[in-house]
Amino acid sequence: MKEYLFLLRGGKPVTDKTEAEKKAEMQAWGAYMGSLGEKGQFVGGLPLVSGGMVVTPEGLKSEPVNSGKEGIVGGYLIIKAENQQKAAELAKACPHIANEGNIEVREIAPMPAM
């Protein structure tokens, strides 16, 4: 199986959710991550702290890191799937989609032997 990076962008801010919505979302995430783990498809991933900086040849920019209309990257997952279509199917089932977010799916290139 190949590895894929899910960049979790946008989504409804946690401050706009009720306690019941937060609890339901956490349960959905637990079920999703559990399913990936049971199938040996979960490699890693974490939420990201808001803010950040961009390093460019001109220096550092500490303004909010924004990825355009798709929204700020708020977290990532690394999963295993047979191909990009199967990875996209896993992304569609992710609770982040139900949270008004979107997911960029990118294949991770294997490192060549040194």
Predicted regions and their residues:
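Conserved, structured core segments of small domains
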Residues: 1-114
